[in-house]
Every structure is written in structure tokens, then in C-alpha cells.
Amino acid sequence: MKKMLAVTLAVLMAGIVAGCGTKTESSAAAETETAAVKSEASDTEQAQESQEPSASGDPIRIGLTTVLTGDRSLEGEYASNAAKIITEEINTQGGVLGRPIEIVIEDALGTDVGAVNAYRKLASDDSIVAIVGPDSSNDGMAQSPSALEFKILTTAQGSSPTLKNMCNNDNPYLFQLRACDDTLCAALIKYSVEELGIKSYAVMHDTETSSADQARLFTEALKSYGIEPVVTVPFTTGTKDFSSHIAQVQASGADAIIGAAFQTEAAILIQQIRSLGIEAPILGSNGFADPVTIQLAGELNDNVYCASAWVPNTPNPKGAALAEKYKELYGDDCGKAAAQIYDHISLICEAITLAGSTDREAVREAMNTIGDYQGAITKYDCRTNGDCGRGGLLVKVVKGKAEIISEITSEKVIE
């Protein structure tokens, strides 16, 4: 079921402020729902008007496609929460071009078809200035032709090299804001061979496109060390019983297991491997250290290594501030999907500011002038082409807690 959530400023502010124990009232300057907002620091303190400039006028509307229903609906929950946080921050600081922003959310349903339908509904609305795509390379690639058709700036959350190629060569309206899997997978294999001393590997991967791509990249990185996987075991999205797959891995005698899958399947896979008493290191694609995976797998998520875009205990000050605010408002650790949405909306607003306009083409052109932009996750540089994300984190998960080993950087040369 597709859902349309036209998120107005008043709704966003009510949700955010209620979450942190404050209350809001409309300013005397305007009586509409998009009025500037006063805040009270606490019930025992005298209310003071914000000294920030107020946003007024018609809202600047930004579309967001995310998964609100189905097995991946936790992603949509994180995304929606982050949209509220960044909207409240921007609007209380004067908005963009002096106007408030409004995030319009469509349910991508967790399928390629759902992602395209959600995207086209937003793109066909002339009031939408730019669109944030869902947390999947597959969905981003499926949306790419529509982005080109409607000529609207679209940010993709996926990390596939195939998506990267689309952004750099095929579609000037599509921007990949995560460090690419080719960088992340190579970094994880390098660490496992050179630091952990692992000699033999089994590969288990989902057959959907992005996970299969990650498995291929892991395998290519192993080959650069003269290592071939002792066994490769594919499975399909939605698999709940991995016993036969794990049996193949056990029979192979591999020292470590490489896994490539989305968060739900990753969590089930980890649970079942550890429940069988297998203690071998698991080297996972970026979702294996995500709070969604950790929440689902719990303490069984142990001795798991991952090259990830994000963990809540990030050393990045801007990311740490977001993680703290998210925890305060929602009681949960800030997931990758939330951090990505926060950065995507921030970058789009930066492009609108640089353009000095809400014209779609002007905003897209302005996006290509952004360089060295510090987000919550990493720095972004969009000046030469459409892949903008520059870094990640090498992480070890110990009994459900992500510990950062080192930062991963992917420098971009500006000519």
C-alpha cells in the first residue's frame, strides 16, 4: 500500500518537541501552520522567543521515497524520524531562501516497482524541487530513468558500483552519496588478510543485484591476494531458514564467512550461524553493523567485521550530535538510514541555497558545485561527477556493540 505523508512544519515541530519534553506555540507574527515557532526550554523556565530568523512563505517541498511497509519498514521509520529532525533544525534557523522546507514522503514498498511508482508520483508534482531515493541500490537504479525523464535532482542512498556508473556516466540528475562498495569491500578484505591473518573464506550472498555485486567485489579483492573462496553459497531475499546453506559452509572448512545481504537477512543469517556454535569471523557488507541488524540479531551479532558507512558512535562531531539527538527523541540508536536522510536533505538544501532558486535545473547544477561538505556521515564532494561520498568506517561488532577499528577514506582528485 502506498502512503502519502505530506509532512507540514506544524506536524514536524509537534512531533519533535513532544519527543523531547518541550512545547510549541505559534508566533504573533503569523497565524498559519507554517508560522515561526516559539519554544519553552522546560515547564519550569520562562518561555523565551528564539533569536533565530524565522522562515515564512510557501514551503520548499522535497520528496522522499522510503520503505514504510513490509520487512524493511524499519528503514522507513529511521528515515521519517531523520526527516523530522533535519526539517525542524533548518526551519528554526530561518529555512532555505527564507522559506520553510517540507518533506513529502512516499512509500517505496521495498520493491523496484514500488520505488518507481513512488518516485514518479513525486516527480510529476511540479512543486517538488528534488527527491531523496530509498536505501537500496536496486531501487535507485530502477528510479534512474525517471530522474532523467523528469530532470529532477535525485540523491541515491545505495553504494553499488553499477549505481555509481549511472551517476557518473549516464544520468546527470542522479547523485550517489555513499562511498562505493568497491572501496569498502576492498578495505575489509585487506584488513582481514593483513591484520586478522585469515587464509580461507566462504561467501554467502543474497542473489539480488546489490548483494551479488558486493559478493563479486569481495571475491575480486580476495583474488588480489591470490585467494579463491572455498565455497560460494547464494540465497534469495526473504530466506528464513539458512540451515542447508550453513551446512555447505561448515563442510568447506573455511576460516571465515563473508556475507552480503540487507539488514533483515543479515540478522537472521548471523543468528543461525552463531546458534549452531560456529565462532568463525563473519565479514559482512555494510548493513551487518547497522543498528537494525544489531537490534534484530542482538548479542549473537558477535565477532562480525564490516566496512560500513555509519555507526552511531561515529567520531565525526556532526554525526555524534545527530546520534545524540536521535537517541534523546526516539530512544533508539540512530541507524544508517536516518543518518543518510539527514545528510541527503542537508545537501539538497545546500544546493537550493547555492542556486538561489527552486528551479529544478538550477538546483541540479548547484549540486555539482558542492565540495568538501561535512555531513553527519562523511564529507561530500560532487564537483566532478555524481558519486559524492568519500568515506566509511571499518567496524567490529562485539556482542551487539559496534566498535570502530579505523576510518576508510576514498579521496577524490579535483582537476
Question: Whereabouts are the PLM-identified features?
Answer:
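Sec-dependent N-terminal signal peptides of Gram-positive bacterial secreted proteins and lipoproteins
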Residues: 3-23
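Immediate post-signal peptide segment of exported/extracytoplasmic ligand-binding proteins
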Residues: 36-38, 43-66, 92-101, 193-199
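Beta-alpha junction/loop-to-helix N-cap segments that form part of ligand/metal-binding clefts
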Residues: 74-81, 93-166, 235-240, 263-267, ...
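Extracytoplasmic ligand/sensor domains, especially the bilobed periplasmic-binding protein
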Residues: 128-231, 279-305
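Extracytoplasmic "Venus flytrap"
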Residues: 54-56, 60-82, 106-113, 135-136, ...
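Extracellular/periplasmic periplasmic-binding protein-like sensory domains
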Residues: 270-342, 396-398, 402-404, 408-414
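Bacterial lipoprotein signal-peptidase II cleavage site
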Residues: 18-30, 37
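Segments of small-molecule ligand-sensing domains
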Residues: 328-338, 349-404
